Amino acid sequence: MTPEEVLEEFRSAGALLQGHFILSSGLRSPTFLQKMTIFSDPARTERLCRALAEVITARFGRIDIVVSPAIGGIIPGYETARHLGAKAIFVERDPGGPFTLRRGFSIPAGSRAVIVEDIVTTGLSARECLASLKDEAGEVVGAACLIDRSGGRGEIGLPLVSLVTLDIPAYSPDALPPELAAIPPVKPGSRALPKP
């Protein structure tokens, strides 16, 4: 699947939005990728995650376990794991706490794991996911996402592959360009805004 085909999946689903958005990180952006619109369509999700599994295999080889951060990463993680023939597990957090691996999930010795995210903006969720796996016996070999909107600047601590890398601007609320500041902001994501 080419980058343009991936973006067309988002466009045709109405999931590539323009306006003034407050991202989960608290940063502001003129573009928002509403991935849950994508994940509400099983056929579209299957196409994208099959393509992501191919990219993962090409870069990292054999994968035994896909680990995703809850909630946004669970659907693409599961569907990508299905195409990899791997197990799908996830990390979750108590409100305000760190991610933890629960529910009897583990990464046993000798296994190779990859973190699968939906969209990477700063890499925070993937970094927090990786930190929660530090005591696992298996090896976390890399990370993957459908769209890397950081322009390749997301800091994860692992090699990152994606179907598309975009350089979508994100601004601090106190450094907005005038054209963005003129539009009332909306908060479409799921994570609570950071406390000032």
UniProtKB/Swiss-Prot annotation:
Database matches in InterPro entries: OPRT (IPR023031), Orotate_PRibTrfase_bac (IPR006273), PRibTrfase_dom (IPR000836), PRTase-like (IPR029057)
Binding site for orotate: 121, 149
Residues that bind 5-phospho-alpha-D-ribose 1-diphosphate: 117-125
Keyword Signal: no
The protein's required cofactors: Mg(2+)
Main enzyme class: transferase
One of the protein's GO biological processes: 'de novo' UMP biosynthetic process
Protein's pathway: Pyrimidine metabolism; UMP biosynthesis via de novo pathway; UMP from orotate: step 1/2
Name of one Pfam family that matches: Pribosyltran
Gene3D superfamilies recorded: 3.40.50.2020
Annotated keywords: Glycosyltransferase, Magnesium, Pyrimidine biosynthesis, Transferase
GO molecular function, one term: orotate phosphoribosyltransferase activity
Annotated catalysed reactions: orotidine 5'-phosphate + diphosphate = orotate + 5-phospho-alpha-D-ribose 1-diphosphate
E.C. no: 2.4.2.10
Family recorded in the similarity comment: Belongs to the purine/pyrimidine phosphoribosyltransferase family. PyrE subfamily.
Assembly mode: Homodimer.
Function (record text): Catalyzes the transfer of a ribosyl phosphate group from 5-phosphoribose 1-diphosphate to orotate, leading to the formation of orotidine monophosphate (OMP).
Name of the protein in its database record: Orotate phosphoribosyltransferase
Organism: Methylorubrum populi (strain ATCC BAA-705 / NCIMB 13946 / BJ001) (Methylobacterium populi)
Source organism phylogeny: Bacteria, Pseudomonadati, Pseudomonadota, Alphaproteobacteria, Hyphomicrobiales
